[in-house]
């Protein structure tokens, strides 16, 4: 349904179908379909339609609720960071804080501390707790992973 130049109507229909038939696909297929929907939202957001940020967060929230993000029992670091960034841009501070607390232990052990501290620093910065943000950022090692 989502082609390179897909329409918002196609997107809405896809989301409607996914909600109506949640058990039709295996987890891996469902993850791929949601990734296409996410990418569509991101393209629309990048084209200047900021209303789609809330659509994207809804997609993320559904996948979180269904545990679709977990790969081999771990939450991918990039998805974790993207979800935090989007939630903060939408000023959904309480939800972001709950998300981080609930899922930070699901990050892979080799990335757990770094990714969690980076998200926490973002959260503190967004909530204007600048001293806390700086304190937490001191514990972040930046890599290009």
Please place each PLM-identified region on the residue numbering.
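Solenoid-like repeat scaffolds
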Residues: 19-30, 61-74, 101-112, 137-145
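"A position-specific structural signal for the A-helix of alpha-solenoid helical repeats
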Residues: 35-40, 78-82, 115-126
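Catalytic core segments in nucleotide and nucleic-acid processing enzymes
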Residues: 112-113, 118-145
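Residue-level signature for tetratricopeptide repeat
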Residues: 4, 43-46, 85-89, 119, ...
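Hydrophobic/aromatic interaction determinants used to assemble and anchor large protein complexes
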Residues: 1-44, 63-64, 79
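Alpha-solenoid helical repeat scaffolds
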Residues: 45-48, 68-81, 85-97, 112
